[in-house]
Structures are given as structure tokens and as C-alpha cells.
Amino acid sequence: MDNRTKALNLVPMVVEQTSRGERAYDIYSRLLKERLIFLVGPIDDHMANVVVAQLLFLESENPEKDINIYINSPGGVVTAGMAIYDTMQYIKPNVSTTCIGQAASMGALLLAAGEAGKRYALPNSRVMIHQPLGGYQGQATDIDIHAREILTLRSRLNEVLAKHTGQSLETIARDTERDNFKSAFEAQAYGLVDQVLERRPDESIQAG
């Protein structure tokens, strides 16, 4: 049994009483009803497809009500992350983001991409920004092609981070040269999040 299968087997079930009797949900499906999406783990094409589908579904359910994404991710594939990013910007509902644990690399970009004023981090979470990673091997001409693609992606990611943080392109380029780790409060000062939440506000005790 691989780690993914083990993780799926550990997902709790929630049982609700309805007029037709009991109905069981896995915890993530139940929270999706409250417009909560969990972006947890490495960002790959499968995760991107699932998150994009959830965003589009919630938009169809109510295009005027906020969607909340909780992020605990080490990052992952740039194109997969940008699929989520583009969908967040495309749909009508405001998308709030909250970092729990860590938001690194593409996870940090998606955290910053939440609706302005609705981007949060919990106090002990960590945020890390850096440039896209290379490592392609092959013929020299192919390596050159991939190197140019990485530079193109880096330029675009820097533009996105600058847009959402308010930092200059020069600052973003300098600060992403190497892995750049930040505490929740440092991420707030940098413009990656708007507020560090130590407790849920009293008026929003219910899920969502």
C-alpha cells in the first residue's frame, strides 16, 4: 500500500441526519459544501484538475459567495499551479486563501493570489518563495530550449508576485534568487498575506 492510498484510507467520514435518513460524507466533501477547498501536498496536474473542478463547481452553485482555499503545500509543477491561479482569477466569486503549515514555491504564489484583503496565514505557518527549478537533461539544443522556457516562466512568476504583493519586479527578482523563507508575520510585511490569524473571528465560528 503506497502513501497516497494510506492517506486516503485515513480521511474521516462525517455522518449527517437528513429527512431521508443518514448520509455519510468524507470530511473534504462535507467542507466543500461550506465552500472550503483544501490544497494540501505537492501541486501536480491531478491536484490542479481537482482544485479547478471544485472552484468551477462552487462558482456554478453561487457566483456571489466567497470561496476559501486552505493551503499546506511544498509547491510543485509550475504549469499545474498556474492552472489553479488562472481559474482563481477567472471565476466570479472572491477567493480567500489561508496558509496552514507551509506555502512554498507555487503554494506561496497561490496564497498571494487570493482576493486582496482576504489572504491569511496562521501564526506558525511558513512561506517560501524562489525561482523555478531546472534540472533538464538531454541534448545541448534541448537543454537550451528548456533553459529559455525556465527564464520565461521565471519572468512571468515574478510579474504575478509583484502584482499581488506590491513589491517591485527588481525586488521580487532579487528575493527569489535563492530559497527565501518567511514567517507568517514576515509574509504579511512582504505583502504575501494581509493578516495573521491567531483565532477565528467571533462572527465566523461556522465553517466557511
Swiss-Prot record:
Subcellular location: Cytoplasm
Similarity remark: Belongs to the peptidase S14 family.
Molecular function per GO: ATP-dependent peptidase activity; ATPase binding; serine-type endopeptidase activity
Keyword annotations of the record: Cytoplasm, Hydrolase, Protease, Serine protease
Function: Cleaves peptides in various proteins in a process that requires ATP hydrolysis. Has a chymotrypsin-like activity. Plays a major role in the degradation of misfolded proteins.
EC code: 3.4.21.92
GO biological process, one term: protein quality control for misfolded or incompletely synthesized proteins
Entry protein name: ATP-dependent Clp protease proteolytic subunit
InterPro entries: ClpP, ClpP/crotonase-like_dom_sf, ClpP/TepA, ClpP_His_AS, ClpP_Ser_AS
EC top class, as a word: hydrolase
Species of origin: Stenotrophomonas maltophilia (strain K279a)
